[in-house]
Structure formats: C-alpha cells, structure tokens
Amino acid sequence: MIINRRILKSFEEISHSLEESLREVAFDSQQQLIQDVREENEELSRLQDQLQLIRSIVEKICISIKTDNIDSYCSVPFDLLYNICKDIADPSSFEDGDLQYLVSQAIFEYIILLCYYSVTNECVQGLPAVYEAEQYYKTVSDSILKSFLYCLQNSVSTIRLLSQTVLKDVNKKKLSHQKWSLKALSVDLLEKIRPRINKFMVIRNFRFVGLPKKPIEIASLVSDIPRGIVHERLDMVTQSSKYYTIKLGQLITEFDQQPEENGMFTEVHLPNYERRLKSLQDFFGLAMSDSNLLDVIRCSAKFHKDHPLRRFTKPSILTRYWPSILLCLLYGPSSVMSLWNSRYFIQDFIKTNVVDFAKGLILNWLWAPLKQVWSTVKHDEGSAISVTSQETLNSDMDSLTRMIVSFVVDNSDSTSNSPIDPILLSTKVEHGDLTEFMEIYETQLHHPIKNIATGGLVRSLLIQLQKTKVDGSMALNGIDKMLKSQQLVFGVVALSPALVILYSSIVALKRFVKLGNVWSNEKRYREQISISLNNVERVLNYSKQGADADEEHLNQGLLVIEVSNLYKLGSFLIPRSRKKEWFRDVEELVDTNLDSGAHINVVNRIYHVYGRFLIH
C-alpha cells in the first residue's frame, strides 16, 4: 500500500528519536538517572516491558510492509494496545525530559501510528471498491432492464430485512405487553416507508410535462420504481464515498503536517504527539477535550471490526448470481443427464475436432515441414524437388561428345591435314566449343543433296538433334536448381501457420498462469492506469486553485486513492527488474514535501520512462 512506506519511515523516525533522546539524557545526567532508576525501578521496568511489546508489534508490521506483496496488511491487536495504554499515565504527567516521560511518549507515539496504519489501510483498500460500486450503480441506473434485474437479485435480502424488522416490532410489542395484529404491523410498516414513497413520487412528478395517458403513466410507474431504488442507492454510495474521501484526505494532511518551528520544541521531545492524536480524533469525530488515546484505540478497533466502507460496495457475488444458480439447480440435472446420454457423440466430436486436429497440426503442419526444411539444409538429394535427373543429363552429354568426336575424326581428312587429338576435342566439346564440327557441317551444306545421299549430312543433322536435346536438358537442370534453392522458402511458408498457432497457445497459457486469464488483462490494466494518471494530473492541476478546506481534503484523498491504484496496477506490467524504481517514483506523488509543480514533473517522468510498459 502506498501509505505504508511512509508509515514505515515514521516508525523508524520514532525509534531513532527515542534512542537519540535516551542517549542524550543519559550523557547529560548519568548520576541523577541512576538515582531515579533506583527509586522508580518498578515503574521503569513496567514501561520497558510494555515498550518491548509495542516494538514487537511494530516489527511484525514493518516486516509485512517490506514484503513484495502490495496488499499485505498485518492485523493490529487493539485489545493489547488498549490494555497497555490503560496502564500508562499520560506523558504530560511526567517531568519534561524525564526518562519515564521519554519511554511513555514513545509508547504513545507507536500506538498512535499503529491506529493510523489500521485506519488508512482500511480506507485506501475500501474506497476503491466504493468507487467501483458507484460506477456499477450508474451503469445499472441507465438501463430499465438492469434495474429490474437488480431488484430481482436483491429481493431475497429485502424480504429478509423486512422480516427482521417485523419480527423486531412484534418482540418489542410483546415486551411492552401491547396487543398487536397484522393490520397494526402493516400500518406501522407503511408509516416507516411512507417518506421514501413520497420522496419518490415528488421526484417522479417533475419528469412529466402535460397530462400523460393512463396506460403510459402506469407503465412508467412500473419502470420507475426499480430505477428509483437504484438511484437512491447510488446517491447514498456517492455521498459516502465523498465523505470518507474527505476524511481520509484530512487525516493524511493533518497527520503528516510538519510542526511549527517556534522554538518551543527541544531535542528530547518526540515530535508530532498532540497533533497526530488530534488528527485521529477529528477523523472519528471526537472532541479533544473529552477524549484521549483510549477512545481513539476503541474507535480504531471498531472501525476495523465493522468495516463501514463495505456497506457501500456493490452486491455480493451470491446476491448477483443467485437467479442463475437457481436456474442451474432447476435445469442442471436434466442437462447433465442429457449430456451423459450424448457422451459418445460428444466423445467422437472431441476426438474428431480437437484430438485429430491437434494431431494433424503437429504431424502434418509442424513435424513434416520441419523434416523437409532440415533435409533441404543438409542437402538431401532424395527429398529434393526434381524436374530432370542429373545422371540423364550426364549420359546425354557424354553421348553427344562421343558422336562429335567420332564424326570429326571420320571427316577430318577432307577438311584438315593436321591430325585430330580426341582428348583435346572431347574437352572442347564438354566446354561448348564445337568449331571443328560446325566447319564440317558448313562444308556439307555446300552440296546438300550429295551429302544426304552419301549419309554425311544426315549424320550431322542427327548430331544437331542430340545437341538440341542436351540444351533442353541443361535448361531443365537450371530450373531444377532454382526450385531446389526455393525449397527452404516453401518449407518455412508451410511451417509458419503451425508456428503461429503454437506461439499463440504458449502466450495464452503464459498469460493464464501469470494473470489468471487466458485473454490477458493487460489491456484492462493499461486502461485503468491511463484513467488513474489522468485523474492524478487533474487533481494536481486543481489542488492550488483557492478551494475550501473540504475541497482540498477531497483532492488529497482522491490523489491517495488514484496513486494507490497506480502503485498496484503498475506492478502487474512493470518488469521485475524495474519495480523498485516504479515504487519510488509513484511514492513521490504523495510526498508532502513536494509542491504541485514537482508532482506534475513526477507524472511527466512516469509518462516518458514507463510509458512503453503502461500505455502502448
């Protein structure tokens, strides 16, 4: 909780101030203290024991505050505090600077701070629920259907309260030996609810202009009754939220207000005793002259036990959902039997649409593409896409080489007097150099008919046909290589849908484990943080506009509530490594030592430092 850090600091200040005061008194008048201790050994021993009890309680609370749990709250044993305070005289009854004065005042300071800890935690934890209830009732009041549903949901509790009221009246009449009857009870009950009915009818009459028709008026009356009930509850919740927010702001402002430096305080005094006690007395409406610390402890214990803010929250889950639960109880058994009779159909449906889908997704869309990609990466020729065989191309090329070499050797006498080297000629043909063959072919074309008749030109044409076949095979081989180079891309494309589905499932599972919802609450958290930051900035902008005391206390209370929401919601979104920075910066928003301009700068710092975690 945002206030707890400041309370922890106050505990440390009290302990440090007590130690310094005791050390200074012991140093200044050691001999006199020894004599006083001998004379009042029993009283000092009792005070020391009570101080140790108080400090043990304080240590437990400090340990609870220092934990990482934001909503941690350590219950305060008010009965023990009451007994301790009852046995201790007021510090003003001792001499100023006396050892008993220092110890008793330290005990009182601790007790006051423990009461403040309990009250502020109740308010800071309870007021957000009250404001949430206010928003809930506003939403319900805007709809006739929701208003009817609200009245239906609360009908059971209304009947129960009515029965308790009637029973209480009957018992009262029995105790007073008065006669009673159903008619008399009905009259008494009508007299009790008559003011509410009159108020509702007066407000309702302002809505009509002219004289509506009778059916319309009756229908309007039926629809206005539920909405009137909701509006009455809304007004009560709104007034209560404003009242307790003002009280909280006043308590925080007065409790943390620095004392005036008028030269009346000495170093042995523990600070803020009377002022802090008065702030708690004002919170509970106690007169300072007629009340003391015992009354504050009693009121704090009652405030913690009764939880007055919980009376203004929205209806409980059982109240809101008992109609649905009743329908489930009425129609649930038959629905369960119907499901049981259809269990085989449901089983087949799940197997076909869930199990087979998951199995096919893993095997066909994840495992098979992964194998294909792996085979492509390690150059597995057996799994490659093939348009033509490499062995076929090699055999065709070898055949063409032999045909050309044989043809050139057979016709070399007629074209050249130099001997032909078959090995050199084979090398030239393999590299695409067909000069010798083309020269013979050109010579044969000079006498085509003669060469056709002798068969030489026919042989040349067949070689040309073989060359065309080899060229086509080489083109297909190039296409085959291009397809092989794209095979990895095809595999990744085939794998991508399954990877997207798998990644989404893992992210949903992670969010379910972390945030408790398959569909992440991050969007809702970011929206609430944006609203809180906006409200914080508005409160800070209007805090110094010459408002009255109640308005200033209301702004202070709203600021604490909104900052508390920021403190809590931001912990869900801020990375663990930066949570300490986040807590430090948010706590500066309620630091009373900073003015409104410095607070605005803190808001701007939050925007540009943590904006990528909270807003975007």
Curated annotation (Swiss-Prot):
PTM-bearing positions, type Phosphoserine: S29
Key words of the record: Membrane, Mitochondrion, Phosphoprotein, Transmembrane, Transmembrane helix
One BP annotation, GO: mRNA metabolic process
Primary location group: mitochondrion
Secretion signal, residue range per the UniProt entry: none
Topology within the bilayer: Multi-pass membrane protein
Record's keyword annotation contains Transmembrane: yes
GO cellular component, as recorded: mitochondrial outer membrane; mitochondrion
Keyword Nucleotide-binding in record: no
Domain of life (superkingdom): Eukaryota
Localization, UniProt: Mitochondrion membrane
Any Pfam family the entry gives: NCA2
Spans traversing the lipid bilayer: 321-341, 488-508
Any further remark recorded for this protein: Present with 2940 molecules/cell in log phase SD medium.
Protein function: Involved in the mitochondrial expression of subunits 6 and 8 of the F0-F1 ATP synthase.
Record-linked PANTHER family: NUCLEAR CONTROL OF ATPASE PROTEIN 2
Family of the protein in this entry: Belongs to the NCA2 family.
Name of this chain's protein: Nuclear control of ATPase protein 2
Species this chain originates from: Saccharomyces cerevisiae (strain ATCC 204508 / S288c) (Baker's yeast)
High-level lineage: Eukaryota, Fungi, Dikarya, Ascomycota, Saccharomycotina
